[in-house]
Every structure is written in structure tokens, then in C-alpha cells.
Amino acid sequence: MIYNFSLPPLLIQAFLFENSSYLNKWSKKLPKTKNGNSYLNFIASHDGIGIRPTEGIFNDKTLKNFLARLKKNGSKFSYRKINKNKKKVYEANITVFDALKITDYDKIGKFSLERYISAHAIMISLDGVPAIYFNSLFGTSNDEAKFVIT
């Protein structure tokens, strides 16, 4: 199995900014798998949304805008230390449902469910084995109350 770690942030970014250019460019470069191998396509897991897989794909401005939108939608972030004085976002701690909830074009989330279902449809349609995270079956939102007490 080849885990498609780049898929979650690229797919979410495409919906948030109504621009699939990064997702399209990345997907066209995916090599065909050899016999006995397959991609594992997922957009949610217990680990949050990995940001590191966007390195070399997103430019600085795109990454900055992406992280800002995720923060507005309720994300907390985990960081990795680059050196003594510098850290970078490692992952966004937000459910996919909440990540897709609000965009600059849909400020009240009128089409959040449509984005959520469409994101899963795209993930399922890609070459490979689709993996749907259990919590995604229910459109789970962030649990802020539990986050605060842990």
C-alpha cells in the first residue's frame, strides 16, 4: 500500500479556494502502481490533516492562505521544530467536515455538506483503495470541549 498523504490537504485546499490546479497537477504526476501494489486514498484520519506533504507543491502564499482558512474554520496546529528558533506547521488538527465548512465564497457554510460529500466522491474515484475514516461517516465536527480538558 502506498499512502496518499498529499491527498487530504490538496483536496481540501481545492474546495476552500475553488481552485483545483494543485490537486490536478499532483494527480497527473502520480505514477502507475506495479502489480500487487495500490494507493490508499484517504482524506481523514486520527492524525489530523498533514501539512508536510504539501512541501514542494504549495508555494508560500498558498500555504499561508490555506493555514489561515483552516484556523478560521477552527483548526489547532501541531508543529515540528526546524531549528532552535524556527518551527513549521506539521499538521492541522481539525475534522474534514469543519475544514470544509466555510470558504471565502460561502461565508455561512450553505454548501458545506456538498463540499464534504464531493470531497469523498473524488477520493473514492481515484485509482487505488478508498479508506473512509469512521468518524467521517457521520460528518463529525471538532470537539472543542474535550480538546480544552485534555
Model-derived features with residue positions:
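Active-site and adjacent substrate-binding regions of carbohydrate-active enzymes
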Residues: 1-150
